Amino acid sequence: MEIVISNSKSELGEKAAITGAGLIREAIQTNGAANIIVATGASQFEMLNELVKQDVDWSKVTAFHLDEYIGISEKHPASFRKYLKERFVDKISLRNFHYVNGETDPHAECRRLGEIISKHPIDVAFVGIGENGHLAFNDPPADFETEEPYLVVNLDEKCRRQQLGEGWFNSFGDVPERAISMSVKQIMKSKTIICSVPDIRKADAVKGTLEGEVSPMVPASILRQHKTTWLFLDRESSSLLT
């Protein structure tokens, strides 16, 4: 794992975006096209803002959505489809973007997306880490073993409180209890993982990811077993590392 510690969130976002864009260009040069995964949440603001500015032939890129709440409208402020359309998809010209639809039958949606992603080996996965150490919406204890590319998952209280704290919902009761998430194994199949984790509120999760045991209780700790992961931190998120 390559660990890069920046002085600020903006510097972190720029470095992560430049690194990721270079890997996308390499995939296009080698294969004629690239397949990527894109994450959401407050931790990805700076990275995505810089990524759309990079010199990439986006018309050769197919992108996949990491996760989505079950049961909220695409127009809801917390919808990850809305987030990605506004911050990423509408700013570039992708070959294709495969959204997770949380308003349809969730198990059928998992099967639909699983069939598509199985035909698109992922070159670069842009991900983050939650305050509870989750990877995508795989909250602890995460399922490290399932081969299913997408899962219906239950969101734990700490995860739901993080979403409330970031301002996506008006009350804790408004935060959905379930979501569709890409599985840990599917994320780990990615050729390269770019993990962007700013902010002091992520410091405990970063410490657990890097210094504890690799465990389903700290889902992101499994990134240490991936051959090519870049972990981008800032001074605050790295402040508890020894």
Which residues make up each language-model segment?
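N-terminal glycine-/serine-/threonine-rich phosphate-binding loop
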Residues: 1-36, 107
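Glycine-rich N-terminal segment of FAD-binding domains in flavoprotein oxidoreductases
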Residues: 25-54
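Glycine-rich beta-strand-to-loop/alpha-helix junction loops that act as flexible
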Residues: 38-43, 127-131, 198
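Ligand-binding beta-strand-loop-alpha-helix segment within the catalytic cores
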Residues: 58-126
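Glycine-rich phosphate-binding loop
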Residues: 120-145
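Class I SAM-dependent methyltransferase SAM-binding "motif I" and its flanking Rossmann-like core
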Residues: 136-182
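ATP/nucleoside-binding phosphotransfer catalytic cores, i.e., glycine-rich phosphate-binding loops
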Residues: 182-185, 189-242
